[in-house]
């Protein structure tokens, strides 16, 4: 069965794979030139002009990888990080658990959805050629380099990086956690968050070995897993 499928237009690559996961095998790659209902975590809108950015989703069904669910989001962030390093992009950082930043502005968002014990859909949105954004906190590769990129070539490069990193994860040889820790966007920052429906200010301390985030809340250390916390600007 074909692993790489591209749509000119779709509501959302993640939604498509979620609705059709039984029809496709492990590591199926679905991309689109334009998403009419692209979204990030907590259904936040993901702004992307047609044919200017990379938007794709990958289906995971491998049992070992599903057991590594807590590692996947950070691993995907490091895949994007490695691609950007290869493009000589500097001032990179990774915001736990799923965003990549350049000089404090978001260049990539990652979304995980599914039933972790059965299947997982990983959605990646990477700003490439778009120049103007409604959100001043967004940035693209072209904004940084002043170069226009072939999206098909860049997508396939990123796909190869992802496949290679997943193989390393299976062998317990991935260095994703080291990369995330060395480029931790949140480390030592005071941030506004929502925990258990309560607004709080916390200090981010570090990323733990189990991929959880250690924060200081009212002088008390607390470990947070992805999904338990929402960051606010």
Where are these regions (language model features)?
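A short coil-to-beta-strand element that immediately follows conserved catalytic motifs
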Residues: 28, 90-96
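Conserved active-site carboxylates
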Residues: 99
């Amino acid at each position: 069965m074909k692993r790489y499928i591209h749509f000119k237009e779709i509501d959302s690559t993640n939604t498509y794979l979620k609705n059709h996961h039984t029809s496709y095998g492990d590591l199926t790659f679905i991309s689109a030139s334009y998403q009419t209902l692209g979204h990030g975590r907590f259904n936040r809108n993901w702004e992307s002009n047609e044919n200017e950015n990379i938007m794709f989703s990958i289906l995971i069904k491998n049992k070992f990888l599903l057991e590594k669910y807590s590692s996947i989001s950070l691993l995907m962030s490091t895949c994007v990080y490695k691609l950007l390093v290869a493009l000589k992009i500097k001032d990179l950082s990774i915001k736990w658990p799923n965003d990549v930043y350049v000089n404090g502005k978001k260049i990539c968002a990652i979304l995980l959805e599914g039933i972790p014990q059965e299947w997982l859909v990983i959605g990646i949105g990477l700003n490439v050629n778009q120049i103007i954004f409604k959100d001043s906190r967004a940035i693209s590769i072209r904004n940084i380099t002043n170069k226009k990129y072939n999206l098909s070539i860049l997508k396939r490069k990123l796909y190869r990086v992802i496949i290679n990193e997943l193989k390393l994860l299976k062998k317990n040889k991935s260095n994703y956690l080291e990369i995330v820790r060395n480029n931790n966007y949140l480390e030592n920052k005071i941030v506004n968050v929502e925990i258990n429906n309560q607004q709080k200010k916390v200090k981010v301390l570090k990323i733990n070995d189990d991929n959880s985030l250690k924060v200081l809340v009212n002088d008390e250390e607390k470990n947070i897993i992805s999904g338990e916390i929402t960051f606010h600007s």
